[in-house]
């Protein structure tokens, strides 16, 4: 059983067919622009999604024109999140799926259910890749008061990684962490010397993925295992993808991501977060 009340026509946001189809078109525009700009007009091999309502929405995304003649596998299940939103992963069929799992976050100190972490182990060109798609608990109530929730998730994920991955495999941890690269849930509890946070790097492209009260930073991050810097894989680029059409300027001249909603008011934008990406290639 899932909670989809937020996405119905009689909800506070008054979702309807027009708004839904418009949102699909906006997502298509962003993904298409990213493919053109960053990947020679090819769609990404892996696409992580956050705040997805259900499998039907994913199918509708894959039915947009940019995905025609593309063959993606879907990794998703309905999560127990109180808002009815899930994480998902789209994978091109050239990858072989060895294992998939949905890591349940059951914090006894938190009475609000949250999203599962999506995990998949893939094989491609005789290499093993571990992919984790995250959407950690929000800062509702303040960063400090809610910090224990994200620390709990970080510990769950770190333990899972230690039990289900090995040092000769390539690991990618991505998503909306609702914390910044310098917060302790990331630095103290998740990270170690086996990982590199691409958004805590001088080479990162962009000033952030999210603007909170006029300050840009990285709630959305991609963390990779340090062996991505070995001789067989070359890291090409990474950062937040942004185009002018994805942004708006407020009355004070501050630039923000152009969002779909502000509270319950429909603005018809794209998202209050910018998409993040990283690109690598195999070296023969």
Predicted regions, residues:
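N-terminal, active-site-proximal structural segment of metallo-dependent hydrolase catalytic domains
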Residues: 1-65, 75-79, 85, 252-254, ...
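Second-shell loop/turn segments in exported
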Residues: 9-20, 43-49, 76-77, 107, ...
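Structured beta-strand-rich core segments of catalytic domains in phosphoester-bond hydrolases
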Residues: 46-48, 52-129, 136
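Active-site metal-binding loops of divalent metal-dependent hydrolases
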Residues: 52, 136, 176-177, 274
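Extracytoplasmic/secreted cell-surface and envelope-processing proteins
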Residues: 56-59, 83-84, 140-143, 180-185, ...
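Active-site His/acidic residue clusters
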Residues: 127, 133-146
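A long, amphipathic alpha-helix that forms part
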Residues: 144-168
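Metal-dependent phosphoester-hydrolase catalytic domains
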Residues: 159-171, 178-284
């Amino acid at each position: 059983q899932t909670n989809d009340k937020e996405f119905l026509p009689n909800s506070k946001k008054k979702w309807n067919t027009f708004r839904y189809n418009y949102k699909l078109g906006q997502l298509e525009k962003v993904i298409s622009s990213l493919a053109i700009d960053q990947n020679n007009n090819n769609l990404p091999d892996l696409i992580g999604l956050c705040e997805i309502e259900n499998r039907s929405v994913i199918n509708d995304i894959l039915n947009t024109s940019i995905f025609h003649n593309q063959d993606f596998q879907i990794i998703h299940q309905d999560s127990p999140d109180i808002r009815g939103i899930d994480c998902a992963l789209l994978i091109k069929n050239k990858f072989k799926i060895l294992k998939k799992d949905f890591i349940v976050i059951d914090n006894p100190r938190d009475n609000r259910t949250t999203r599962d972490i999506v995990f998949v182990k893939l094989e491609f060109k005789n290499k093993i890749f571990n992919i984790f798609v995250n959407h950690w608990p929000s800062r509702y109530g303040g960063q400090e008061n809610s910090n224990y929730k994200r620390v709990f998730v970080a510990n769950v994920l770190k333990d899972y990684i230690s039990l289900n991955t090995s040092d000769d495999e390539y690991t990618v941890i991505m998503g909306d962490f609702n914390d910044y690269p310098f917060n302790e849930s990331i630095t103290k509890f998740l990270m170690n010397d086996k990982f590199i946070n691409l958004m805590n790097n001088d080479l990162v492209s962009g000033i952030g993925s999210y603007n909170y009260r006029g300050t840009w930073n990285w709630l959305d991050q991609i963390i990779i295992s340090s062996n991505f810097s070995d001789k067989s894989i070359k890291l090409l680029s990474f950062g937040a993808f942004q185009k002018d059409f994805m942004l708006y300027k407020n009355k004070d001249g501050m630039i923000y991501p152009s969002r779909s909603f502000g509270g319950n008011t429909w603005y018809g934008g794209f998202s209050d977060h910018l998409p993040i990406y990283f690109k690598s290639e195999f070296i023969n």
